[in-house]
A protein has these predicted regions:
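Helicase-core coupling region on the C-terminal RecA-like lobe
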Residues: 110-215, 273-275, 322-328, 332-372
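Conserved RecA-like ASCE ATPase "motif II neighborhood" in helicase/translocase motors
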Residues: 1-30, 265-268, 282-283, 288-322
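Conserved nucleotide-binding/hydrolysis micro-motifs of P-loop NTPases
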Residues: 2, 21-22, 44-48, 54-56, ...
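Structural motif
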Residues: 16, 39-41, 186, 240, ...
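Conserved helicase motor "Helicase C" RecA-like lobe of SF1/SF2 P-loop NTPases
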Residues: 216-266
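Metal-dependent catalytic core segments for phosphate chemistry
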Residues: 26-69, 159-207, 277-294
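Helicase C-terminal subdomain and adjacent C-terminal extension
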Residues: 50, 54-108, 254, 287-372
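ASCE P-loop NTPase helicase motor core
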Residues: 1-129, 354
């Protein structure tokens, strides 16, 4: 790539932009004016520039509560209504719009990934299945085993292509074991969600995560696993939530596990990161409560609590893709299958894990099965 001066300023023969899906339109456009040729690289199936709906609406609510002029208040309320109604459209990155509209002769794509175990790859490859010119679907290929197996299950984790974890816990949760052959697990919980401001929390899922962390902290095989890594990022268990209030709840709970290396955040802030072990808290449920002390009432409600059917943030395929694709060796999903399987992308995830001989679907009542 050459750089040269001209009367209009600096010019480049070629400009390469990476992580372009996270760029705003201005950030994407500005470098283009300096290049004769432009190569824009990104993943149109991941999240756009960070735009936190909760923070956005909370800020608007603050302004509405503090503004003095009637005209300004009316405009802010109008903006809030627009954001709530059109947030899905706002979450489409400029890179995605360009990629989907540009002439096919001007674009290409990588179809192999080398991050994750093939069992995890199977779960996320649906997000990359697009019809080609022959009308046949294609998806994401795991380069660790295709065209040849590079040692993906090699117990020697110094092999850079190994995605073995070696953790063995006989009584992991609800009477089920975790073995070294397990790489994808869905823990199916039935606990209700609760509204906190503009956010959501699920106390039952926090209990499940606490139980899992306790099992890891007591496990000799997990300690041996950690000893194999010099880098703290490799040791860390990543915990991802779709909601900031749930993240905060998990962080408070995790103060009891200071001995464990943990990274806890919302899915948007995990984009671009990876960890060997990832736990995903889905939060949303098919039942909802208004108070954390609310008890089930089966005389009034079939499921004990009022029903709800909204997936909220979790309905975004790009957000789900980011959450599930952070893991290299072990992915644990904690969520209510009765709600999420109503949407095909989640039903696919569930069925892929269920059909995998080494996958696990574990039914769990977080108030009974793990809190006796």
């Amino acid at each position: 790539i050459t750089t040269y001066n001209c009367k209009d300023g600096i010019k480049f023969s070629t400009v390469i932009q990476d992580e372009s899906s996270k760029a705003t339109p201005a950030e994407l456009a500005l470098p283009l004016v300096y290049g004769e040729k432009n190569i824009v690289i990104g993943d149109h199936r991941q999240l756009p520039p960070m735009l936190d709906k909760e923070e956005f609406i909370n800020t608007l609510d603050f302004l509405i509560d503090n503004v003095t002029g009637e005209s300004e208040m009316k405009q802010l309320r109008k903006l809030k209504t627009y954001v709530i109604k059109n947030f899905d459209e706002m979450e489409i990155s400029h890179f995605q719009r360009i990629y989907e509209s540009i002439d096919p002769s001007l674009k290409g794509k990588f179809t192999r990934q080398y991050r994750m175990h093939p069992d995890i790859n199977e779960v996320i490859k649906q997000f990359y299945e697009e019809k080609d010119d022959n009308d046949s679907a294609n998806g994401l290929i795991c380069g660790l085993i295709d065209p040849i197996d590079l040692g993906v299950n090699d117990p020697d984790m110094s092999n850079p292509f190994s995605r073995y974890h070696g953790i063995q816990i006989d009584d992991f949760i609800c009477g089920e074991a975790l073995s070294a052959n397990n790489h994808v697990i869905w823990i199916d919980v039935n606990s209700p969600e609760m509204i906190e401001g503009t956010s959501r929390v699920n106390e039952g899922e926090v209990n499940v995560i606490s139980h899992i962390l306790k099992k890891f902290s007591e496990s000799d095989s997990f300690k041996q696993y950690c000893d194999k890594w010099a880098d703290e990022d490799d040791k860390e268990i990543g915990i991802i939530s779709f909601y900031s209030k749930q993240r905060n709840k998990i962080r408070r709970m995790c103060k009891s596990f200071n001995d464990l290396p943990l990274k806890i955040d919302v899915v948007d802030r995990f984009q671009g990161m990876e960890r060997n072990i990832i736990i995903v808290s889905m939060v949303r449920s098919n039942t909802i409560i208004s108070d954390s002390q609310q008890q089930p009432d089966y005389s009034e409600y079939e499921l004990g609590f009022p029903e709800q059917h909204d997936l909220g943030f979790a309905q975004s395929p790009n957000r789900l893709n980011v959450a599930l694709s952070r893991s290299k060796r072990l992915l644990i999903i904690i969520g209510n299958s009765e709600l999420f399987r109503q949407k095909s992308i989640y039903d696919n995830v569930y069925n892929i894990i269920k059909a995998n001989p080494n996958g696990k679907i574990i039914k769990c009542n977080p108030y009974e099965d793990i809190c006796k």
